[in-house]
């Protein structure tokens, strides 16, 4: 005979896989064209000069240079810019 009463089932116990979002290259870092700078959901950061945006809002360098983060405009938007040497 069992000495332990049967436990009930649960509807919890699931979680989604981490998506590894965030800034990948920080201000002042040198990057090559095509390097991913920010992985994000939506436009937390906007694309500035020499920066492109992928269809999942990933920001990437379109030219070699140094990464710079700027806050511009009436709405104080955060822009990522590549400063070429």
From Swiss-Prot:
It comes from the Bacteria. GO terms for molecular function: structural constituent of ribosome. GO terms for biological process: translation. One of its GO terms (cellular component) is cytosolic large ribosomal subunit. Residues 1-20 are annotated as: Disordered. The keyword Cytoplasm does not apply. Signal peptide: none annotated. The keyword Transferase does not apply. InterPro entries: Ribosomal_bL27, Ribosomal_bL27_CS. Pfam families: Ribosomal_L27. Keywords: Ribonucleoprotein, Ribosomal protein. NCBIfam families: L27 (TIGR00062). Belongs to the bacterial ribosomal protein bL27 family. This is Large ribosomal subunit protein bL27.
């Amino acid at each position: 005979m069992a000495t332990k009463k049967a436990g009930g089932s649960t509807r919890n116990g699931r979680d989604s896989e981490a998506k590894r979002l965030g800034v990948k290259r920080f201000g002042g870092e040198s990057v090559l064209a095509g390097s991913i700078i920010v992985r994000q959901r939506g436009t937390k950061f906007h694309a500035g000069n020499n920066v492109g945006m992928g269809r999942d809002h990933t920001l990437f360098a379109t030219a070699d240079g140094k990464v710079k983060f700027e806050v511009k405009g009436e709405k104080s938007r955060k822009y990522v810019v590549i400063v070429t040497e």
